[in-house]
Amino acid sequence: MPDQRTAFSRLQLVSESLAARAGDNGPAFTFIDYLDAPDGTGHTLSWSELDRRVRAVAARLAEVSAPGERVALLCPQNLDYVTGFFGALYAGMIAVPLFAPEVSSHATRLVGALADCDPEVWLTSEAATWGLRELLDRHPVPRPKQLIAVDTLPEQDFEPVPVSAEQPAYLQYTSGSTRKPAGAVITHGALAANVRQVRAAFGVDENSTCAGWLPLFHDMGLVNLVALPAGAGCRSVFTTPFAFIRKPARWLRMISAYPGVITAAPNFAFDYAARSAGEDLAGLDLSRVEVMINGSEPIRKETVDAFLAATGPLGFRAASHRPSYGLAEATVFVSATVTGEAPKTTTFDRTRLGPGERTAVVPGDDDRAVPLVSVGHAVGQALRIVIDGREVPDGVVGEIWLHGPNIAAGYWRQADRSAEAFDGYLIEGAPAAGWLRTGDLGVRHDGELYITGRLKDLIIVDGTNHYPQDIEVTVQQAHPAIRRDRLAAFAVERDGHEGPVVVAEHTTRVKLDDELRGEVGRQARAAVSRRHDLRLLDFVLVPPGTVTRTSSGKIARAAMRRRYLAGELG
């Protein structure tokens, strides 16, 4: 069997696909700006205009650096980000998708990534240069040889530098919080392979429209809103995460305005969108939406149900809601539900979801029931459920291992960490070597994949495994003063025994006093005791905005545990 990680020969690279459209005057990328216009102002580049701008960026990069060097993308989320990314690829350099310092909540991550990869050149927009100079003054980051505002460059002729599929295209910094930043090395071949896999899974072609608001420095945003449109030759329409958070209905209005829409978001976004339904969406037609990818964080049955209930009257089809699974180390996409099938939920016995345990399906009203949403089947890559290096049969929980042409080449200049993650050896398997250990736990049931949680996040008490997300759901349902999806459960050791701690934000609507704080704590502890037969070692109620989240919106439990142990949470 050939090594799937190097099976690139039949793939057209994404940068080649873009260059091939240099003579096309049709619309390519549209950025909708809500900053100064409540209804949004669209700014569009045709394929030919985009190609000319990209060549101008590449020409300038070639003047100040060399192929193979790192180029940091520090543009605001607009068309400059797109031209900067492809400019680096045309120049044969390694793009590093990051963000302008205006995303202040991720400043530590930005500084860490810059220090890790030491890019020679920073690309940005003219309006953002002041923020980068301030960053250099305030933080110990390596100074670039050149800071370039891509929106000020004159057009120049430039011939794209030939690259091989095995060469790095960009470094995708993961949003983990337990160790130093890690840049997954995404090769040109891996990107092309993942674009092909996404196209196969969701039927993306030239008539599709990729639309959304995901941050372009995040793997799901970069692939779905930038690389996929270029590889498929379809239109991209995007706005900013801030525009969505301010008014979630903007997302639904956007996807209703274009044909054949493919859009993607984490689970929490569907919660937001469902709550925005009502008069604000009167007259909206979502019948042309082909695919809404739900991924990047645990997918909740109640979210899926609420979203379908809110958007069904607007013409949205349940089968268009596509729960999926992916991660940066696999470029982004791994698996999805089958075209034409509505989301599927199975209720498992939560006491039998530990690694190596055989699962049991129970009725939904059983006290032990936990509903899990299927994320379907892997597309174009091998997926195995593994315990101690051996594949386990369907129905047994294990770590998800992956092998395919879309898998990253490792972490940038971190050999030990790369070997730990990317050199999994499968006993009695084929291929035997080169498996990606994802760190995610899952189970196959009736041939479909269900994600049960993160291996490193498991809370083990008296030999029993507990998933933190299950405890978090129980706590947030215990009292209306607890803010939804803004809490973290993790384990700490006390007096020689390990037990759970929950840190939860209260809602912005409540005025907290000692009496209410005590009431919330008592109800949270009682709910966890009833539901999970666990005693919380501590329950901490904190103000809104306290709970740390990753760039993709996931709860950063390890970071919260660290902050708790450091006494930072009161």
Feature-to-residue mapping (PLM):
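AMP-dependent adenylate-forming
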Residues: 16-46, 168-171, 178, 326, ...
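Conserved AMP-binding/adenylate-forming core of the ANL superfamily
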Residues: 29-86, 103-111, 183-192
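AMP-binding/adenylate-forming catalytic core of the ANL superfamily
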Residues: 122, 256, 263, 404, ...
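Conserved AMP-binding/adenylation subdomain of ANL enzymes
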Residues: 192-209, 219-261, 276-279
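Conserved C-terminal "lid"/linker of ANL adenylate-forming enzymes
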Residues: 485-490, 501-502, 525-570
